[in-house]
Amino acid sequence: MRLVACLVFLASFALVCQGQVYKGGYTRPIPRPPPFVRPLPGGPIGPYNGCPISCRGISFSQARSCCSRLGRCCHVGKGYSG
């Protein structure tokens, strides 16, 4: 009897959740960019290692490369760490 009551509860809960999802137009989670690399606009490139002197003016892929190769990672509003 408990099993039947539990199954009825779960089935009704699933139907309610499906209705909420459909009403809200929810499709899937929104992907977020990695928190360690967020390039900011404007800035020079360092002469020897190919990584910028500051986090400004570099592409996302260049910032990720500098972070993985040299441990110099850009943080929003803080510049480099490491």
UniProtKB/Swiss-Prot annotation:
Entry keyword set: Amidation, Antibiotic, Antimicrobial, Chitin-binding, Disulfide bond, Fungicide, Pyrrolidone carboxylic acid, Signal
GO MF assignments: chitin binding
Alphabetical list of InterPro entries matching this protein: Penaeidin
Pfam family, one: Penaeidin
Signal peptide: 1-19
GO biological process, alphabetically ordered: defense response to bacterium; defense response to fungus; killing of cells of another organism
Record-annotated disulphide pairs: C51-C66, C55-C73, C67-C74
Keyword Signal: yes
Location of the protein in the cell: Cytoplasmic granule
Main location group: cytoplasm
Protein family membership: Belongs to the penaeidin family.
Biological role: Antibacterial and antifungal activity. Presents chitin-binding activity.
Protein name: Penaeidin-3f
Origin species: Penaeus vannamei (Whiteleg shrimp)
